Amino acid sequence: MTGLELAEYRVNEIRLGRETCYSSGLLEVDAEGLAALAAQDPRVSSASFDVVRPGEKARVTGIRDVVEPRVKTAGSGQVFPGVLGPVAPVGQGRTHRLSGMALVTAVAYEGTVRAGTTSQRSAILDMWGPGADMTPFSSLNNLVMTLDLEDGLSAYEAHQAIQRAEFSVALRLAETTTELAPDAVEIHDPDAAGDDLPRAVVIIGVFTEPDNRPSNVAYYGFPVQESLSTVIHPNELTDGAITPSTIRTVSYHPITWNWQHQPLVLGLLRDKRYRFAGVILERIGFETSREKEIAAHNAVRVAMSLGADAALITRTGSGNAFIEVMLTVKGCEEKGIKTVLVTYEYGGKDGADAPLLYYEKEADAVISTGNRDVVVELPAADRVVGAYDQLQLIGYPGAPYVAAGDPLTMEARDVIAGGIDIWGGRDRLCRPY
């Protein structure tokens, strides 16, 4: 695979107008035309659009996904292969991106699973105040697309409808740049690095549940379930070869924007001290100790086959799936592969509880990306957009509702879109203590 040129077009303002076009930082949006595009899927009844800006006292509800618009202008395939079009290799050629903005998709979908590890939940986003400080999405100019779906859809049908609608609209937005000169171009070509450099890999533990569709992670539109480790080229993430579920939007499960901007992958792509040997997707969340040991052993063997001297190891999800991650750290270290583990921690409401649920002594280089469990107090909003006028702050049947614009008390950061920095993409400073 050859290199990928990533051309940047900065969006400083979004305006609803008569046509969809981009010029000198202004993105004009034809809401009626984009609504018709989203509704080409018969499972989508209608779509509407709003704009929210950084610092505005606006709250977005019912968020199912966040996407940075991108389009391929050279090379094989198109962005989001296997979802928008046929499966074709991506990660080379040229891709345009609209930076400084995102398409935020909100949907009032109530799935059949309302509690437990497979609960189907949406997220919220505050564009100001303490909630905004927890998420990168509050600093973006956001185009909010609210979808109405046909009644009676299964979780997988709803996911397909949401994803196809949002990716189609995101692609249309990015297509406004195809004939324009970019503000900047970044080239990602890990294969051009010298063979004499140390070889590094990124291992991402991806949490999935057996027999549960949509899976939390899909590769070229194919759900990753019950699999052992898969090697992918780092540039494939840039072009949307990895996509998430839109049904379970809690912050420890990354959404599309997170995969497009995976910070450990981007860091190694830009670091000329290493040869980036590949990204390993390690399926985690197995149910027995034996299965967990096999998954970790397999990930270590794959890293060895790539000639890895070093590994950045991180994860998605929560719960006992962390056992596979820690066993992978242990296995890599035992085979001479130097590791750094990047993970959020639990810590309890005051940060004094055990931060991780499982340890191995080989994990002697760990970066914390913050405490998931802190209580969040959100002030009242002047404006509410998105799918819900009322919110269930605790995701179980019978939980009380509150007005979406009222002051809110959240028991953790989970329900804030981007509220948990699972991979260390923020500019927070960690100190040892």
What are the language-model segments listed below?
Residues M1-P223, A403, P407-L408, G425-Y433:
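Long, compositionally biased, glycine/small-hydrophobic-enriched stretches that function as flexible linkers
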Residues V366-P400:
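Extended, charge-rich low-complexity interaction segments
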